[in-house]
Amino acid sequence: MAKTPVRARKRVKKQIADGVAHIHASFNNTIVTITDRQGNALAWATAGGSGFRGSRKSTPFAAQVAAERCAEAVKEFGLKNLEVMVKGPGPGRESTIRALNAAGFRITNITDVTPIPHNGCRPPKKRRV
């Protein structure tokens, strides 16, 4: 007796109207994560994972490419509105927001969530170049 082939069910992508874009812009890299309102990650992309290595990773253009890749990945969820949370002092802060805006998302809110110590840990020593 032949077995009937088991068909895998297609996973239905849930439709989400608005989400949150978390941008972590350090001096060396930029990480873009798009989540739903509860914080469940829908897609993420980095400047390093987008093909940039070394010092090119820390450029505004690399951050822009990472944002475009992340935006392309969440299009299937039907995302329309984005709230943007920016963390860090890196060069990719502004270009990432511009890229998300150009990708067709309506940016409702931009918040800077860079952690500021209330005189916490001792900072690293100053660079001598």
UniProtKB/Swiss-Prot annotation:
UniProt KW keywords: Ribonucleoprotein, Ribosomal protein, RNA-binding, rRNA-binding
Gene3D superfamilies: Ribosomal protein S11
One Gene Ontology molecular-function label: structural constituent of ribosome
Record's keyword annotation contains RNA-binding: yes
Superkingdom of origin organism: Bacteria
Gene Ontology biological process terms from the UniProt entry: translation
Annotated Gene Ontology cellular component terms: ribonucleoprotein complex; ribosome
Leader peptide range in chain numbering: none
Pfam families referenced in this protein's UniProt entry, alphabetically: Ribosomal_S11 (PF00411)
Function: Located on the platform of the 30S subunit, it bridges several disparate RNA helices of the 16S rRNA. Forms part of the Shine-Dalgarno cleft in the 70S ribosome.
Protein family: Belongs to the universal ribosomal protein uS11 family.
Subunit composition and interactions: Part of the 30S ribosomal subunit. Interacts with proteins S7 and S18. Binds to IF-3.
HAMAP family listed in its UniProt record: Ribosomal_uS11
Protein name: Small ribosomal subunit protein uS11
